[in-house]
From Swiss-Prot:
Function: Displays ATPase and GTPase activities.
Assigned protein family: Belongs to the RapZ-like family.
Top-rank taxon: Bacteria
Protein name as catalogued: Nucleotide-binding protein Saro_2904
PANTHER family: RNASE ADAPTER PROTEIN RAPZ
Native species: Novosphingobium aromaticivorans (strain ATCC 700278 / DSM 12444 / CCUG 56034 / CIP 105152 / NBRC 16084 / F199)
SUPFAM superfamilies assigned: P-loop containing nucleoside triphosphate hydrolases
Coiled coil: none
């Protein structure tokens, strides 16, 4: 590690079974961490010398490692001893997260999923939970961060993880803006769909019919519609409100679709204008026109108007 490079962030994630470890690790992975579950901590020093297995991970990327009482060779005392030793390295920043939860809530979760607690054998889940809590107590006392998930929903825990460990690691939301023709069906995976069929239709102007929403004359025609400016501004402002919120909530992908009858004029023009406005605001949307070159869409538009 050079003198200027930051130490690699290592987050050890443990806690009571059913308290949310899997959700925490998945959230961290969505945030750009390399996540590994059920890893024997005694092998941690060897793992740190291994190159990342994922092509998207850079050497030194933050790493989240999950382990619990089921992990092979689980031993709280040895884990604490090893981590204390590794924490002395200047190239590592190791944090331990412990996920806790009230016993009654854990019982409810086990009953709801109809799963048996691994330490309860033929006894009630409460017995296994109590034994596990006693075994984990040294780790709970030693952990840097304790999150109690008793009253949490899955979304609550995801947000708590982002708030606690987001820091400078912010994976931007991938934004796709598309145009389409309703006559060919709606895009099945769009998050937001805007219907542009209220705007004046260039299809009915002979000179504009063979052109598309990417041509200047078509754009000028659509802009003359008294409703265009206000509609554009309201849609733009709504997206500028929503997109940062989506990113804060960890939404990886947002697909914004604009539709008109054939998908060649009004929807194309609005999609182009909104994409340009979002780029000016600092976003990097990908722009797709599904039916732009479709002769069939043009024929259908002539039928439906």
């Amino acid at each position: 590690m050079s003198a200027d490079s930051a130490p690699q962030r290592i987050l050890l994630v443990t806690g009571l079974l059913g308290a949310g470890k899997t959700t925490a690790l998945r959230t961290l992975e969505d945030m750009g961490w390399e996540a590994i579950d059920n890893f024997p901590i005694r092998l941690l020093d060897r793992l740190l010398e291994t190159e990342p297995g994922s092509a998207r991970m850079e050497p030194g990327a933050p790493m989240a490692i999950g382990f619990d009482t089921r992990t092979r060779g689980f031993d709280p005392s040895r884990t604490i001893e090893l981590v204390k030793k590794l924490s002395q390295r200047s190239d590592l920043q190791i944090t331990t997260l412990f996920l806790d939860c009230a016993g009654t809530e854990l019982e409810r979760r086990y009953n709801e999923t109809r799963r048996r607690h691994p330490m309860s054998e033929d006894k009630p889940a409460a017995t296994g939970i109590a034994a596990e809590r006693e075994l984990l107590e040294p780790l709970r006392r030693w952990a840097d961060v304790v999150i109690t998930t008793t009253s949490f929903t899955t979304n609550d825990l995801q947000q708590a993880i982002r708030d606690q460990f987001g820091g400078e690691i912010a994976t931007p939301t991938t934004i796709t803006i598309s145009s389409f023709g309703f006559s060919r069906g709606m895009p099945p995976l769009a998050d937001l769909v805007f219907d542009m069929r209220f705007l004046a239709n260039p299809h009915w102007v002979d000179d504009l019919r063979p052109q598309t929403g990417r041509d200047k004359a078509v754009g000028e025609y659509i802009r003359k519609d008294p409703a265009f400016d206000e509609a554009f501004e309201r849609i733009r402002d709504l997206l500028l409100l929503l997109l940062p919120r989506y990113q804060e909530q960890g939404k990886a992908y947002v697909h914004i679709a604009f539709g008109c009858t054939g998908g060649r004029h009004r929807s194309v023009f609005m999609a182009e204008q909104i994409a340009s406005a979002l780029r000016e605001a600092g976003f990097s949307p990908t722009l797709l026109h599904r039916n732009l070159s479709s002769r069939a869409a043009d024929l259908l538009e002539g039928v439906k108007g």
